[in-house]
Amino acid sequence: MSKRDPTSVLLPTVEWGPVCEQLHAVLNEDDELLVLCDTPSDPVADRETPSGVDVVVAGEPSGCSGKANALACGMERASNDRFVWTDDDFDRGPAWLDRLITGSQRHGPTTLLPDFAGGGWWRLAKPALLMLLTVRTLLFERRNSGEAFPWGGCVAFHRDDLETSVDALVSDLRRSLSDDLVLDTHLRGCRRDPDLDATVRVEGSADAVYHRLVRYMRADHVHDGLEPELVLWSVVAVIALLFPLPAAAIATLAVGGALASVDQLRLDAVFAYPALLVLPVVIAMGIVVTDFEWTGRRYRVRAVDDVEVLDRDV
């Protein structure tokens, strides 16, 4: 085991799976793995765990997402000053945790850029989101050179890296939908480690992609407002319709280059032109649609601090 800070690893999940085993296998003696579930009826809730692992029952969310509620509970329970937030939907190698934590010790908050991979309708959605996020970073966001957006599925940071406090972070988590966006407001100077990767498999059915896109866009809209981006991409889509051949060539090359730069599958670039045309519709969904499903719950999001859990087990 490497010499590094004792770390609390927070893993929201309702069952004991391969990721739990992977993380437990690489814990140092003073680390802890907190497996965060929702209710006592979850499969993992009454499981006997090995040394260094505790199951924490966060309870049903109220006014926030289930994941945000679980992470808030985990931050309150954590006994160390360095934290890792991660998800259970991708595999990681034996050196993954050490690299993430030591990177955060040397360079400050550290994250990675995930590859959301899937078939079906996701092949159209992925290049649309890539174009949106790339242009947003260039034109709309105010980040320093080299600063990355912290992805809640893989991020390491120290208590002192927070601009406010753990209590303030927990308070915001308990009234929000997106743990990523909440962490982004509390954690500045995050860097991306290009040698860390995560491939997350995404369901490609029309229904699954619809709810995923609404969740992404609605969270962005209630935090920052999507109207300026809707105007921009509507104009771009009209130009692309008027000049289809050059627009298709430019979009395909741009998306292919962006994917190649982060070692992701470049085949998705062939859908760049149709993705460009539907992007205004995707953005408009985030402005207009308030309800969506996520991991067994239906949510209604009216504002950044107005999150209602409508139903579970949908």
Task: Give the residues covered by each predicted segment.
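Catalytic donor/gating beta->alpha subdomain of glycosyltransferases that bind UDP-sugars
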Residues: 116-118, 125-126, 168-227
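A conserved acidic beta->alpha catalytic loop
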Residues: 15-17, 36-49, 60, 90
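Acidic donor-binding/catalytic loop of UDP-sugar-dependent glycosyltransferases
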Residues: 86-103
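Short beta-strand-to-loop acidic/aromatic patch adjacent to the donor-nucleotide binding site
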Residues: 71, 80-91
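Short, well-formed alpha-helical segments that are part of the catalytic scaffolds
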Residues: 13-30, 43
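Long helical/loop segments within the catalytic core of UDP-sugar-dependent glycosyltransferases
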Residues: 56-73, 101-165, 272-281
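Cell-envelope/extracellular polymer assembly enzymes that use nucleotide-activated donors
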Residues: 5-10, 32
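Membrane-embedded multi-pass helical conduit in multi-pass membrane proteins
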Residues: 228-300
